[in-house]
């Protein structure tokens, strides 16, 4: 008989035993061979077998391997994730540190705030002391000394007449700053009707080198030649002053001290604005300047400037109107007899300077427009140029002067003037400052050799310094000294008063101090504006740390009034006109214009 399935010994079975308990309690595992006979598996095949030997043993379960692989994979993913996280975090930290460093560096740099204002490309020439020669003292004061001299540019065979303004050794840092501020303003302007700065010398004492004028200041000139000044000259001067002021307005510069004394005469046909001691440059977004104090010309100032210390181009227009009035009255003193402390109340009540006898109503109405309380109602300088230019084409129609057609101003040649001015100098190489600078395309570029000697010119073309006045002979008219260190200073030179009177000095009433004085006596600093001080006279003065300048217009000028004070002193003063030159003059210490403790009456 044949088994249907498998043979296990003597038995027929459906399947070979797998894990059946056999002899000696051992497990028996068998497999079916090719003849379907059950054979014993290899002892090492603990889970049965499919064939003989170890080869027949079945492979182990894959589940642990899969589990191990999954776990290992997960661990790898975690490690990779941590690595990526650490990398990103490190990158974030580096970026954060970089941004922090950039922000810190940016804080060290000022933020950009473009103003849209054109750059000031003016050049300032720094001169060596060996390049100029001092010839003669023009004047001295508390600020230092002004010399007449020659500028001899290094490497060139030319000599240029100049005025040298030198601060004294003991000058304060504030005075040095102010003179450098004036140098900045003067170096920033370049116009035929504005005085220019030739250079600056930075020695132990700062020195400004400016043009030298042959005819002095316009105020002296019209007083000396009032019988020979015709309508055409007066109107032409008005046009030129307006042109100079219009140029300053275009440069956003407020002059703050326009007056006939601050206009210099180059020739009878050519005048220039000077004295930038109070001038201020406005920023691109500034419409006005607020002053803090100092000596100011009260009788030339607009009402808003007196009351609120607000200065604009339109306040300069007011001063222009007063300057025109000075010209039309041949140097009369504005508001004569009225104390400076009362000017504001007088103006608020509607009073103005009277119509000059030679002026038609056309000319006077222009002045009146300049003195409107509302600054915006005053004419612009470009409008004043147009008005006076029209009048200058037909002078007798607008100014009525007796014998006008026969009037003629003297005009000495340069040769005569400079031989008088520089008696001991060789005249062959003398060149006018304008003639020297004209060939230069830049303001102060490299020197040019194409110049015409001054001796060949037939009209005087020299210039005075920004604050000096001398006459055609170099010694008749006084010279104005530094306008912001001496003239606007509270520092007295009172110990010179008696000797100054003996030498013919007189106080001038244009300026009053706005700064708080250290002591009341500082109000009585003498100012000798229109008297010449010779070298002999200077030698008689006591030699101490202060100097008295006979050519200043405002050391103690009463129109420069102090508004930085507490309540106005109620003393009433009287003073004679400062241009009176005869007699034994005594300085009236009760001059109302010499008050230090001043506030406008309306403000007290």
Swiss-Prot record:
One of its GO terms (cellular component) is plasma membrane. PROSITE patterns: PROTEIN_KINASE_ATP, PROTEIN_KINASE_DOM, PROTEIN_KINASE_TYR. One of its GO terms (biological process) is negative regulation of apoptotic process. Its EC number is 2.7.10.1. Signal peptide: none annotated. GO terms for molecular function: ATP binding; epidermal growth factor binding; epidermal growth factor receptor activity. ATP binds at residues 138-146, 165. InterPro entries: Egfr_JX_dom, GF_recep_IV, Growth_fac_rcpt_cys_sf, Kinase-like_dom_sf, Prot_kinase_dom, Protein_kinase_ATP_BS, RTK, Ser-Thr/Tyr_kinase_cat_dom. The v-erbB oncogene transforms avian fibroblasts and erythroblasts in culture and induces sarcomas and erythroleukemias in chickens. It is a truncated and mutated version of the receptor for epidermal growth factor. Keywords: ATP-binding, Kinase, Nucleotide-binding, Oncogene, Phosphoprotein, Transferase, Tyrosine-protein kinase. The active site is at 257 (proton acceptor). It comes from Avian erythroblastosis virus (strain ES4). It catalyses: L-tyrosyl-[protein] + ATP = O-phospho-L-tyrosyl-[protein] + ADP + H(+). It comes from the Viruses. The gene is V-ERBB. It is an enzyme of class 2 (transferase). Pfam families: GF_recep_IV, PK_Tyr_Ser-Thr, TM_ErbB1. This is Tyrosine-protein kinase transforming protein erbB. Belongs to the protein kinase superfamily. Tyr protein kinase family. EGF receptor subfamily. Residues 132-399 form the Protein kinase domain.
